[in-house]
């Protein structure tokens, strides 16, 4: 069973009940109001968290205690925290109620202080309340946290009146909730959910002493008295009453009894606590007379004299009476379980209905059979027997039913629960109106009566209008309404009575139109034409010229053009007659249809005549195909002639289009009309064939396109070649070299033409010394050096006379022609220049070149010199045998090649390069090596104990390389299996130890050079027998040598410069015995477990590698060596440089 917890913060005790049993009133059939205490236990996870926190109460050494203060006085609460195990100051918070943080309330009436005593290492936190007020009373909480540690403490503050007696208190004003102050203020006031009503004036009642009523009343009557006299703060009233009735008789069995009542939310947890006078008494708990047994729902705890009952997951069935017995005595209490607020889960929806229909407004709430209230425009709906409103409940559904809806029912309806509300609008419309007899159009003679009559389905009034204006009754005009029939009677019809009449029933958006026509002489209405009665039509379109006419009887219309009458029929040009118009129709207008047309109207009332001018306009003809007169790299110039026919309207301008020849998509080049007959298209792709065409534009539109122009290709020559230089000169030739042009273009590059001319043959004059401008030479004086175009950028001009001076230029040629020439900056003398020879020995040949027997030797030695030098090779001063060694020479290098090297090829090779009288020599040492021969003689010098002393002589043949060591092997005479004893041994004598006594051994020795071991080994002729019997060998006694040595650096650190981003290393060497411990430091701080550094120590050499250093890694680095005999340090500086990008 868990440890009992402290009484909940929000548990408020109620006065003890009087001796009367409240169950008697229950039996009488009444529902008494109960004394209760509000218990709001945090459910689930929050409670578990608080229980866990209470178990970690390890921070407070002194907790604040509850207290009592009078109004206007001061009080201080103190909390202390031990700081021995804390590295920093803990965090403390003061709360009032559950969540009100008092840190933001500090000021005139509240001060928070904190101090720290260094000797005792105790933090003291104080909360001082200055000039306390009534609303300061309540439950307070202090919380302290440090990292993962937490501690909390709750305490109560009671504020008493400083003076006065209880009967003088206005209890009804003191305990009305204001919604401010304590944490439970306004908690029981549900007036915010009720509709605001007008305050009714009540008759003044005589003054009543409510305290006396409460003191003498039963606890079951407290709530009744509180609501009767307007007391809403029931909890505060019970607290005050409890303090007034403290002189209660104490029980012999209970030192502290149950509170009169408890309240808890549904699903919450409640705790009942009693304190026994004698802890040995047996306690039993009962619910409604039934004994409670321990379970997961009911948990019993014992804490000293306290007996505690926990009820988990409280439900509505737990709302009942509980009592506890101890011996012959018992104490009881009431538990009230408060249901959660009812929420609206499905909102009301706006509804539209017709008058007389049944309307249903439906919503859903979170609980079945919940109590909800309906409102209409804020007024509560109370259904009754005579009311048209009914309310139906189906589980969670609540439906408001309105029978026979009227326009008065259109309003905003809302539903309200304890936890939410919803509203919707109801619109009630009239029934659709049916037209039984509509109005009809009428034609009347002048002076006759006009009667407009209609019949509708409803007996409602209406309004008459003529041409949108209300009809005014007069002696001649009467409006008649009889039941569903409406009439408009006009006597003695006049011409102005003609028009559109409309009847509109009231309250409906319905109109009944009718036209009245009064007979009149024929008229031709030409208001829709121009001032000169001209009609313009586009050729190819259909002309339908409708001329409004009037007259009664309808006049006969006759159309004519000149002397030719136009008849009705199916021809291209025809007329059509209608009661109110006559129409001239031309199906496909042509240019020849232009002219003056006449219309004649005739009826019994008279005649009318009119003339109309018809003008037929057309698109212009397409222009003639344009001509491209000039072409550039990305542009051209084009011209064209205007079209022969402008379509009867002046040409406004032209549109130009172009396309690639291989494409079918035309692209417009101008969006503003081109007024001229010439245009320059730009931004074309060089080397691509194009076509262009023209559109003519007049006021009617755009003509058809002209025929495309002949295809043309924008091309441009390349830029001149660049960097023309002299590559070489001989007595009869000049070799020139150049670079390709910077800009080649779409026409590409077909090749180059190299030209030259002799100095003095013309008036050659150089414009500048850089050769960028042309020489002042006639074109016929230049000689083409290459008959055909050349692709390479190097060419040799041959057949030149010696000592002549020539000018040279080069041109780039493509499909557009030859580019501007590139000139050499000065005349060239045709005479070969002697260049002294020079041998470029490769670096690896400046030392002895070593190869093994059988490997190939291939050495390339470059040289310089002009004209081509003469080369001579010698080996050790003698001519080289070309049958064994191949020599190949070129203009720039010589190659010595030996396919399969032999030891006889070793020696000194001399190379001589000669140009005219200039000579250059160089030497190369070649060493061909092979495996050595075996040692000459191997002897056994001495045998003693388990040891054998061997000596041998070096081999006669060292393989043309120095002997680097020997390998010694031994073999037992029985098995003759050879085992290596010593490898890479440098001396010619050795002692073989740890041989097996009683065995007989043979020994052999291999020679070794840089090629490897000798193929054969020399074996001892005689064997060495390790005798079993012999003298006992006694090891001589030597004094132990002291190898201890303090650390000493044999190679110091040096100052180093490193490049940022490249690994850097610091090296030093140290000696000492015992082996010293190495520690690296940067700026006097030891480097430990840093991934940017790696430390190595091998055979006394200490290395610190800094991976990809940055300027931050610069500084002073120190290597420290420590052993038992001493400590030594050495420093250096590292600077990291950043290479600018």
From Swiss-Prot:
Phosphotyrosine found at: 823
Region (Disordered): 1-51
Homology family: Belongs to the immunoglobulin superfamily. MyBP family.
Positions of post-translational Phosphothreonine modification: 406, 798
Record-annotated Fibronectin type-III domain positions: 622-721, 722-833, 934-1029
Name the UniProt record assigns to this protein: Myosin-binding protein C, slow-type
Species whose genome carries this gene: Homo sapiens (Human)
Residues that bear Phosphoserine: 611
Effect of residue 223 to K: In CMYO16; changes in electrostatic interactions resulting in increased myosin binding; no effect on actin binding
Pfam families: fn3, I-set, THB
Swiss-Prot/TrEMBL keywords: Actin-binding, Cell adhesion, Disease variant, Immunoglobulin domain, Muscle protein, Phosphoprotein, Repeat, Thick filament
UniProt feature coiled coil, ranges: none
GO molecular function terms attached to this record: actin binding; myosin binding; structural constituent of muscle; titin binding
The protein's assembly and partners: Interacts with USP25 (isoform USP25m only); the interaction prevents proteasomal degradation of MYBPC1.
Annotated disease: Arthrogryposis, distal, 1B: A form of distal arthrogryposis, a disease characterized by congenital joint contractures that mainly involve two or more distal parts of the limbs, in the absence of a primary neurological or muscle disease. Distal arthrogryposis type 1 is characterized largely by camptodactyly and clubfoot. Hypoplasia and/or absence of some interphalangeal creases is common. The shoulders and hips are less frequently affected.
Residue ranges with Basic and acidic residues bias: 1-10
Keyword Metal-binding found: no
Entry GO CC: cytosol; M band; myofibril; myosin filament
């Amino acid at each position: 069973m868990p440890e009992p917890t402290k009484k909940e913060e929000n548990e408020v005790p109620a006065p003890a009940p009087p001796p009367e049993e409240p169950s008697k009133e229950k039996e009488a059939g009444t529902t008494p109001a109960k004394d209760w205490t509000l218990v709001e236990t945090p459910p689930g996870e929050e409670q578990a968290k608080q229980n866990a926190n209470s178990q970690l109460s390890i921070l407070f050494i002194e907790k604040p205690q509850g207290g009592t203060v009078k109004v206007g006085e001061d009080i201080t609460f103190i909390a202390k925290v031990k700081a021995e195990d804390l590295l920093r100051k803990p965090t403390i918070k003061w709360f009032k109620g559950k969540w009100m943080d008092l840190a933001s309330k500090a000021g005139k009436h509240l001060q928070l202080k904190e101090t720290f005593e260094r000797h005792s290492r105790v933090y003291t936190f104080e909360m001082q309340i200055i000039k306390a007020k009534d609303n300061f009373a309540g439950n307070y909480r202090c919380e302290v946290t440090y990292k993962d540690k937490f501690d909390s403490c709750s305490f109560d503050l009671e504020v008493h009146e400083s003076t006065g007696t209880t009967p003088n208190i206005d209890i009804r004003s003191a305990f009305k909730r204001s919604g401010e102050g304590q944490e439970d203020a306004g908690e029981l006031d549900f007036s915010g959910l009720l509709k605001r009503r007008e305050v009714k004036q009540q008759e003044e009642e005589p003054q009543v002493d409510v305290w006396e009523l409460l003191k003498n009343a039963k606890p079951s009557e407290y709530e009744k008295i509180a609501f009767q006299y307007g007391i809403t703060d029931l909890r505060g009233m019970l607290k005050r009453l409890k303090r007034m009735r403290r002189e209660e008789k104490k029980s012999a069995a209970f030192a502290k009894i149950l509170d009169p009542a408890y309240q808890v939310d549904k699903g919450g947890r409640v705790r009942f606590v009693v304190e026994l006078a004698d802890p040995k008494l047996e306690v039993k708990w009962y619910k409604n007379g039934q004994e409670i047994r321990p379970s997961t729902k009911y948990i019993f705890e014992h804490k000293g004299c306290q007996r505690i009952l926990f009820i988990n997951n409280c439900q509505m069935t737990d709302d009942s009476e509980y009592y506890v017995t101890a011996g012959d005595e018992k104490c009881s209490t009431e538990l009230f379980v408060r249901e959660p607020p009812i929420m609206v889960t499905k909102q009301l929806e706006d509804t539209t209905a017709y008058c007389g229909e049944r309307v249903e407004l439906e919503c859903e709430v979170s609980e079945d059979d919940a109590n909800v209230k309906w409102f209409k425009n804020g007024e509560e709906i109370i259904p009754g027997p005579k009311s048209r409103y009914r309310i139906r409940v189906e589980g969670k559904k609540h439906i408001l039913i309105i029978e026979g809806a009227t326009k008065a029912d259109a309003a905003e309806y809302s539903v309200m629960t304890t936890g939410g509300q919803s509203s919707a609008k109801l619109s009630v419309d009239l029934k659709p109106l049916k037209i039984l007899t509509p109005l009809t159009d009428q034609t009347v003679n002048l002076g006759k009566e006009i009667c407009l009559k209609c019949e509708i389905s409803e007996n409602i009034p209406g309004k008459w209008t003529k041409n949108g204006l209300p009809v005014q009754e007069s002696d001649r005009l009467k409006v008649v309404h009889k039941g569903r029939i409406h009439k408009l009677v006009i006597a003695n019809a006049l011409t102005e009575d003609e028009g559109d009449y409309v009847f509109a029933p009231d309250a409906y958006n319905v109109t009944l139109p009718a036209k009245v026509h009064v007979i009149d002489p024929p008229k031709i209405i030409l208001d829709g034409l121009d001032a000169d009665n001209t009609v313009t039509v586009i050729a190819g379109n259909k002309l339908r010229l409708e001329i409004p006419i009037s007259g009664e009887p309808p006049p006969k219309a006759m159309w004519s053009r000149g002397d030719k009458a136009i008849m009705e029929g199916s021809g291209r040009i025809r007329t059509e007659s209608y009661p109110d118009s006559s129409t001239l129709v031309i199906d496909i207008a042509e240019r020849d249809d232009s002219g003056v047309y006449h219309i004649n109207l005739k009826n019994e009332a008279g005649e009318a005549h009119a003339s109309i001018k018809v003008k037929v306009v057309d698109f212009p003809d397409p222009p003639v195909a344009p001509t491209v007169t000039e072409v550039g790299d990305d542009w051209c110039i084009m011209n064209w002639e205007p079209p022969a026919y402008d379509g009867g309207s002046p040409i406004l301008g032209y549109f130009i289009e172009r396309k690639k020849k291989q494409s079918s998509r035309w692209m417009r080049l101008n969006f503003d009309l081109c007024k001229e007959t010439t245009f320059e298209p730009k931004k074309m792709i060089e080397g691509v064939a194009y076509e262009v065409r023209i559109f003519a534009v007049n006021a009617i539109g755009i003509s058809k396109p002209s025929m495309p122009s002949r295809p043309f290709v924008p091309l441009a020559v390349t830029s001149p070649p660049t960097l023309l230089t002299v590559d070489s000169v001989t007595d009869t030739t000049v070799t020139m070299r150049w670079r390709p042009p910077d800009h080649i273009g779409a026409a590409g590059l077909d090749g180059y033409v190299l030209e030259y001319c002799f100095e003095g043959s013309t008036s050659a004059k150089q414009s500048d010394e850089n050769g960028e401008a042309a020489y002042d030479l006639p074109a016929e004086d230049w000689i083409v050096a290459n008959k055909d175009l050349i692709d390479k950028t190097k060419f040799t001009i041959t057949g030149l006379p010696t000592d002549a001076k020539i000018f040279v230029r080069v041109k780039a040629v493509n499909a557009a022609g030859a580019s501007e020439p590139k000139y050499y900056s000065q005349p060239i003398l045709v005479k070969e220049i002697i260049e002294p020879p020079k041998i470029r020995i490769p670096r690896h040949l400046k030392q002895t070149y070593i190869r093994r027997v059988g490997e190939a030797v291939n050495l390339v030695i470059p040289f310089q010199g002009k004209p081509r030098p003469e080369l001579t090779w010698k080996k050790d001063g003698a001519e080289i045998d070309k049958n064994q060694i191949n020599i190949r020479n070129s203009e720039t290098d010589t190659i010595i090649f030996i396919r399969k090297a032999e030891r006889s090829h070793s020696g000194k090779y001399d190379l001589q390069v000669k140009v005219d009288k200039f000579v250059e020599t160089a030497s190369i040492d070649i060493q061909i090596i092979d495996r050595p021969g075996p040692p000459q003689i191997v002897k056994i010098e001495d045998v003693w104990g388990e040891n054998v002393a061997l000596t041998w002589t070096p081999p006669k043949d060292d393989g043309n390389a120095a002997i680097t060591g020997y390998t010694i092997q031994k073999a037992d005479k029985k098995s003759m299996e050879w085992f290596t004893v010593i490898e890479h041994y440098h001396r010619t004598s050795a002692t073989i130890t740890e041989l097996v006594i009683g065995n007989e051994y043979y020994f052999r020795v291999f020679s070794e050079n840089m090629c490897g071991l000798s193929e054969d080994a020399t074996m001892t002729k005689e064997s060495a027998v390790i005798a079993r019997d012999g003298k006992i060998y006694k090891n001589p006694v030597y004094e132990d040598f002291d190898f201890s040595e303090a650390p000493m650096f044999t190679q110091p650190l040096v100052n180093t410069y490193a490049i940022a981003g490249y690994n850097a290393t610091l090296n030093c060497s140290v000696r000492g015995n015992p082996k010293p411990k190495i520690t690296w430091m940067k700026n006097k701080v030891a480097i430990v477990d840093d991934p940017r550094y790696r430390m190595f120590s091998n055979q006394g050499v200490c290395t610190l590698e800094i991976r990809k250093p940055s300027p931050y890694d610069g500084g002073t680095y120190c290597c420290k060596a420590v052993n038992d005999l001493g400590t030594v340090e050495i420093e250096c500086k590292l600077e990291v440089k950043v290479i600018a990008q």
